[in-house]
Every structure is written in C-alpha cells, then in structure tokens.
Amino acid sequence: MKFFKTLLFIILFPMFSAGQEKAYLPGEKVNYSINYGVVQGGIATLEIVADTFKGKEVWHSVLLGKTTGMADAIFKVKDIYESYIEPESELPVLSIRNIREGRYTKYNEVIFDHYSRSDSAILTSDLTGVHITQKGIHDILSCFYYLRNHHLQDYDGLKKGDMITIMTWFTDELYPIRLRYLGTFEIKTKVGRMKCLKFNPVTEVGRLFKTEDDVTFWFTADKNFLPVRIRFEIFVGAFVAEIVGYEGLKYPLELKKKDTNQ
C-alpha cells in the first residue's frame, strides 16, 4: 500500500518569486482524517517547528500518516516524512523518509548541499550514495511550503488547464511532477466552507491509478494556501483526506457562509 507516499507526490512544485510574505510560520499544524466512503481508515498530521541542524537555525517539517481502526488491524501503515529547511532559501538541508506499510519498512536520509557547486546540487543518501542534481532542488515537504509561498500567492495569473512540470527528489531518484490547474471552487469541510484552488496532479497509471487524473487537490484561496482536501480514485475505490483541525496558522482561515460549487 503506497497511499501516504502518493499523497506526498501531489503537493509540489518549486517556482521562484522573491520578496513575498510567507504563507506560514513555525507552529503551524494541520490534522486530517482519511476516509474510504463513510469509514475512517487513517489520520495524518502536518506540522512545522523551529529547530537546528548542524548548529544552524532551520524549520523542521514533519508529515505523519497512519491507519486507524479496522484498517490498522488489517494492514498497518505508519509513514513519517521529515524535512529540515533553510528559512532564507527555503531549500532542504536534510530529508528523512521512515515508512512502515504492513511488513515493508524503509528508512532513508538524504543530505542536500546547495552551495559547494555553482552549477548543481550534491545529494548524499545513506542508501545510494552521492548524486549530482540540478540547482534549487527540493524534497517533498520543502516543495510543499515553497509552492505555498511562491506560486499560489499569484494564482490570479493561472488559467484553467495550465500545466506546471517540475522535478523533485523522492525515493532516491528524480521524479517529475505535473500539476494541472482546474480553477477556484467553494467546498464544505468539517471546519467550514471555504474558497479553494483546485488541481489535478497528473498521476502515474499503473498499480494504483486507472487514469492520469485520478487525484484531485484543494488549497484554500486565502493567504494560508492550506491543503484542505485530497481525493484519490484508485482501483479499489475513492479515498478522501480532509482537514479536521488546525492551529498556529499565520493568517485566520477565511470561511464562507454559503456553498457555490464543488
């Protein structure tokens, strides 16, 4: 089962835009419920805190996803992803993947060196050694925060159908991400109604997905740009991850009184 791994794939792409206010600060934490139909099958939390790495101040993000209830009894999943991010550049300096899915386990650390080479970055994995990649490369979580700061703040410039293609480092390899913009919609969640930006991350057809459009993602169209709902259409049915709680947001969450479209 690669549910939480897939969840990570879809919230990324880096695009530089200097001088904008950050959409988040350390102390932000978001809680999600993961449901299969009316049955809750798991929970997830995403938070970022102030920390240090090699004596320097960093922002430490942690994404935890795990099964609950009957799903946990049938197939236990506990996936933890961590990113240590430079506040100024918003680039990762350390990425950690620690997953348990049934009997399968994997632990991987990658150190990012963005400065030793002028034309590329050096990535050192504890599993596969040294890799030379393009400058400005992100890991999964740092890309998520970079997305909120440097692309979604300018969403008025996006047109329906616009496609963004980026390259990220995940599971010890370069992985292309394609994100298609679908427009703005108002949706109802467990914390209230809100205007959202809707995206289809183009997924890889195969073991999980039947088509390239089987994942849909909603970000709040306010100053926070929080991911509040993710819908997965996979071979066995539809899973939905939805926000159920939050704290430490930089800006008040903008809630609506009426639905318009979903």
Q: Where are each of the predicted segments found?
A:
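Histidine- and/or cysteine-centered catalytic micro-motif in compact active-site loops
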Residues: 3-4, 204
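Sec-dependent N-terminal signal peptides
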Residues: 4-15
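Generic alpha-helical structural signal
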Residues: 13-14, 21, 132
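Acidic, serine/threonine-rich low-complexity disordered tracts
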Residues: 20-114, 153-262
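Hydrophobic, well-structured mid-protein blocks that either form specific transmembrane helices
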Residues: 108-153
